[in-house]
């Protein structure tokens, strides 16, 4: 997936719930309609980001993907701040 983004958050090596905790902090620093790209190695982050996007009123999950990076699969999440 080649989604444009405004800021990158590297959450590789962090376990649940830290990728989501750090993403929430970063998304608060973005302007509305900017996109945060999060890369994580925690498989559970896929469901975590989906759940967050369903309940949060200020974010939209615009894409998710799995990419190889350094011999490891990383989970990539694109989150847009909408408010």
Segments from the language model and where they lie:
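Short secondary-structure boundary/capping segments
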Residues: 1, 28, 67-69
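Short, compositionally biased "basic patch" segments
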Residues: 1-4, 80-82
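C-terminal edge-of-domain segments
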Residues: 60-83
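Short amphipathic
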Residues: 4-12
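Amphipathic, hydrophobic secondary-structure cores in small proteins
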Residues: 17-59, 65
């Amino acid at each position: 997936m080649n989604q444009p983004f405004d800021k990158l958050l590297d959450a590789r090596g962090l376990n649940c719930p830290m990728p989501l905790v750090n993403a929430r902090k970063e998304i608060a620093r973005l302007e509305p309609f900017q996109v945060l790209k999060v890369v994580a190695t925690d498989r559970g982050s896929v469901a975590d980001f989906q759940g967050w996007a369903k309940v949060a009123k200020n974010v939209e999950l615009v894409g998710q993907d799995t990419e190889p990076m350094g011999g490891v699969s990383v989970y990539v999440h694109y989150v847009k701040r909408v408010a």
